[in-house]
Structure formats: C-alpha cells, structure tokens
C-alpha cells in the first residue's frame, strides 16, 4: 500500500488518526496533550469529514473531569467519543474511567504520558500518570515514536469498537508528542476499510433511546454486583486477540511486524530489557552497538500493556 509522507509530531499523528474514528471530542487542554485537541478543533471548524462522512463535534469543557463526564454521556448516547489529556488531567478523569469501562463503552483516551506533580510540577514525560489507571478497566496500548503513533493509534479505536472495551492510547510526553519526524500517513479510506461497521452499528443500537429504553446505573447488592463484574471478564479475555487481529491488518497493509510484544536483539541474549515507550528506540541503538561487540543483549517492546497477556511473551 502506498502512503503519502508528511512531517509532523506525535500529537499531530494521533489527532489525524483519532479524527477519523471520532464523532464527538470532549476536550480540555493540558500540556503536552493540548495540540491534539487543537488539531481536531481546527479540522472540525473547517468541516473536515471523518470516515463516517460527518464532521466531528468538539466541545471544550470546564475541566478534565467535565471532559471525561461528557465522554461518558456521549458514549451512552451512541456517539464514538474521544478525549486527549495527560498527568493530573488524566487523574481527574479516573472516576469516569471506571464507569466507562464498567459499562463496556468504546471510548478512546489519547494520553501524552507525563509526570505527576508531587513536591513540584513537572511537565515532562514519564509513566506515572498512566500507571495510576491500570486498575480502571481501560485497555492500554503504547507507542514509542511518531511513526508508531500513526501506525498503531487506529488499533486502539478499532479494537475498542469491536471489543467493547475502552482504550487508553499513550505515548511519551514531549519525547514523542513533540518530536517532529517524516512519517507515512494513513489515508482515511484505508482506515475505513479496517473498521467493523457491524460493530459500529451494534454500538449505536445499544445507545440510550426512548424507543427501546433500558435501565442503567442502578444499585446492586454484593452478590449480584460481583457476578456482573465477573461477567465482563470475557470481553477482556478477548481483547489481546482482537488487538492482534487489527495489528495483523495494519501489518498486511503496511508491511510492518507489529505484535503485542516485539523482540529486538541477539537471538541468544543473556540480558534483556523489557520496556515500552520512547526508550525503546534508544535501547535499539545501544543494542546495535553492544551486539556488534559480541555482547548478547536484547529488548522486549511492550505494546499492549493492559490487558496483560504473559503467555504472549513466549511468542517473542
């Protein structure tokens, strides 16, 4: 498949992909994620169409907590909804993340992973914000450079739609979000070709509608609550295979080799780094240098962090 090349940063790559699959974007700015929402807002104002032939409706809220609440409500109304955030902004979204995941709604949060403020503020990249979301029920998919953001961000949206599990798609703040690279860009027709339109239709049919009312958000005692929580396990068990399926479709179109875990380095390595994010590109350069000197070292790149499938690690 032939793709055109453009020079852009990680935020622009994520915005380009997310716009294709988004009907409503609930936004609130926070460094270093703000450009993603800015791009989406600009494209919406210009009337740019997504893969469904409509213009994204953008709503800026009063805070990140409001943006997450708007995502939750919009998803319940049957609109594929996205937001963009980082750091303390992501923490403010956690209460709604539990609800979105618990109700099996296919929202996607694009996160420029950033340090959490502690003794002082830091706007630079680390994974302390996304690590605070491990237990929310969101699937978590990560990329290590701008081209990977372009290539794999569709997997988050596509797997969320088919698997009925929300996704947190993350890449490192500034190190990837603001790094400018020449990247091969998705054409929206190719993204549309990979989208399961039957799953989109089923999602819209589950929306709140007075023509077929349902009761949601009620109270349950411990016995029933526990059973209903366990009932969602089958959706999480299916996510790794669904992600692999869409990675396979991406690989087929692009000639890439994306997997849940990718290995790089000596086949008989006696020392291996397990990592995710922008450190992987640096590690690959170090591995090239060390293996050239006869050292047996390698890298396992983690792409799907949640749900974690340890058995898949043996594949690498």
Tell me what each language-model feature is.
Residues 52-56, 167-262:
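Conformationally flexible catalytic loops at phosphate/diphosphate-handling active centers
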Residues 121-123, 242-258, 275-283, 302-310:
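A general structural motif
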Residues 315:
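Conserved small/polar residues in nucleotide/adenosyl-binding loops
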Residues 263-295, 308-312:
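Redox- and metal-dependent alpha/beta enzyme cores, enriched for Fe-S-associated oxidoreductases
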Residues 1-132, 137, 154, 173-174:
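Thiamine diphosphate
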Residues 123-173, 197:
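Conserved thiamine diphosphate
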Residues 7-13, 248-271, 284, 288:
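Glycine-/acidic-rich phosphate or pyrophosphate-binding loops and their flanking alpha/beta elements
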Residues 41-44, 98-101, 157-159, 184-187, ...:
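Short, solvent-exposed amphipathic alpha-helical segments in soluble enzyme
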């Amino acid at each position: 498949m032939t793709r055109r090349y453009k020079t852009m940063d990680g935020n622009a790559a994520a915005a380009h992909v997310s716009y294709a699959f988004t009907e409503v974007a609930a936004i609130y700015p926070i460094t270093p994620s703000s450009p993603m929402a800015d791009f989406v807002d600009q494209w919406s104002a210009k009337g740019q169409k997504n893969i469904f032939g409509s213009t994204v409706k953008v709503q800026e809220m009063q805070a990140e907590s409001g943006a997450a609440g708007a995502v939750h409500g919009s998803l319940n109304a049957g609109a594929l909804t996205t937001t963009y955030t980082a750091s303390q902004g992501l923490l403010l979204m956690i209460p709604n993340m539990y609800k979105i995941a618990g109700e099996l709604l296919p929202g996607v949060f694009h996160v420029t992973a950033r340090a959490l403020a502690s003794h002082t503020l830091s706007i630079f990249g680390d994974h302390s914000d996304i690590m605070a979301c491990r237990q929310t029920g969101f699937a978590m998919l990560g990329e290590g450079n701008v081209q990977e953001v372009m290539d794999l961000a569709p997997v988050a949206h596509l797997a969320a739609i088919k698997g009925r599990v929300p996704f947190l798609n993350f890449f490192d703040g500034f190190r990837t979000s603001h790094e400018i690279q020449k990247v091969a860009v998705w054409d929206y027709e190719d993204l549309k070709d990979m989208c399961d339109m039957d799953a989109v239709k089923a999602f819209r049919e589950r929306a709140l509608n007075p023509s077929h009312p349902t009761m949601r958000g009620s109270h349950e005692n411990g016995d029933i609550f526990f059973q209903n929580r366990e009932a969602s396990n089958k959706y999480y068990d299916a996510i790794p295979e669904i992600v692999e399926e869409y990675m396979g479709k991406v690989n087929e179109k692009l000639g890439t080799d994306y997997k849940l875990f990718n290995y790089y380095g000596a086949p008989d390595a006696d020392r291996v780094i397990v990592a995710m994010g922008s450190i992987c590109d640096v590690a690959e350069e170090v591995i090239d240098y060390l293996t050239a000197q006869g050292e047996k070292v390698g890298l396992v790149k983690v792409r799907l962090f949640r749900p974690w499938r340890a058995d898949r690690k043996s594949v690498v």
